[in-house]
C-alpha cells in the first residue's frame, strides 16, 4: 500500500496544487491521499468524482493534524518517505525502498516543513536538489517506486476510458 500525506493544505491558496497532488498520486499508483491542514471538502469530492468517472480504488481522506498520521503509520510498520530537495537522490535509494515490500507513507510538504518531519522519516528523498514542484517530485518518486508499471494501468470499472490514439481523441463511455 502506498499512501501520500499532503502537509498543511491551505484553503484557496493550495487548492490547485493539492488537487494535482491527488490526481498525480492516483495516476502514478498510490492507493490513498491523506490531506492535513485546513479541511477542503471540494478536493475530496473532486477526487471521488475522478475515481467514479475513471475507475480504480483510490481514496482521499482528511486528518487535521499530520503528526498523529505519521505516528500511526510508523506504528503500523509503514516506511516513512519525505520528499524534499535536501534529501538523498531518489534514483539512488528507491530500488532499496521498492524491494523491501513494506507499505509506504510518502510525505509531500506544504508551506514550510517542520524539522520533526525530517526526523520521523526513514528516508528524506530528493528529486534533484533544486526547488521545483512537489507534484513533479511525487510523480517521479512514484514512477521509480512502481518501476514504470503505472504508465500502462487500465481501470475497467470507470464510466470512461481513454483509448490511446495518435490521430484523435477517443473515449469509451461505459454504462
Swiss-Prot record:
It comes from Methanosphaera stadtmanae (strain ATCC 43021 / DSM 3091 / JCM 11832 / MCB-3). This is tRNA (cytidine(56)-2'-O)-methyltransferase. InterPro entries: Alpha/beta_knot_MTases (IPR029028), tRNA_m1G_MTases_N (IPR029026), tRNA_mtfrase_aTrm56 (IPR002845). It catalyses: cytidine(56) in tRNA + S-adenosyl-L-methionine = 2'-O-methylcytidine(56) in tRNA + S-adenosyl-L-homocysteine + H(+). PANTHER family: TRNA (CYTIDINE(56)-2'-O)-METHYLTRANSFERASE (PTHR42197:SF1). It comes from the Archaea. Specifically catalyzes the AdoMet-dependent 2'-O-ribose methylation of cytidine at position 56 in tRNAs. Gene3D superfamilies: 3.40.1280.10. It is found in: Cytoplasm.
